[in-house]
Amino acid sequence: MDKKVTRLRRAVPTRRKITQLGVHRLSVFRSNQHIYANIISPEGDRVVVSASTLEAEVRTQLAGQSGAGGNAAAAALIGKRVAEKAKAAGIELVAFDRSGFRYHGRVKALADAAREAGLKF
């Protein structure tokens, strides 16, 4: 098995449990250069809120930094942005879906920043 298949296999039990809970899901995806965060509806059929390091506003804030989209500072900024957008959409309670990634580094930085900005999970 390759790394992607293994990671997705690790994510299955978490996603199954979140589906049973019936709450919005904060899903995280990280690539080598960028990080993405989506809040998905309880039915799992639509993205309610999203934020990533590809957004123009985020790119201007990160301009001049080395590894601009792929570091913990960028992940923390995305966590804060997704939490602010979620609160504006009336969402406070979510379940955290790390998508099979270890809860460490950029994933942890995003989660901590989202909690500090007011999301509950």
From Swiss-Prot:
The keyword Transferase does not apply. One of its GO terms (biological process) is translation. InterPro entries: Ribosomal_uL18_bac-type, Ribosomal_uL18_bac/euk. It holds the Pfam family Ribosomal_L18p. GO terms for cellular component: cytosolic large ribosomal subunit. Keywords: Ribonucleoprotein, Ribosomal protein, RNA-binding, rRNA-binding. One of its GO terms (molecular function) is structural constituent of ribosome. Part of the 50S ribosomal subunit; part of the 5S rRNA/L5/L18/L25 subcomplex. Contacts the 5S and 23S rRNAs. This is one of the proteins that bind and probably mediate the attachment of the 5S RNA into the large ribosomal subunit, where it forms part of the central protuberance. Belongs to the universal ribosomal protein uL18 family. This is Large ribosomal subunit protein uL18. The gene is rplR.
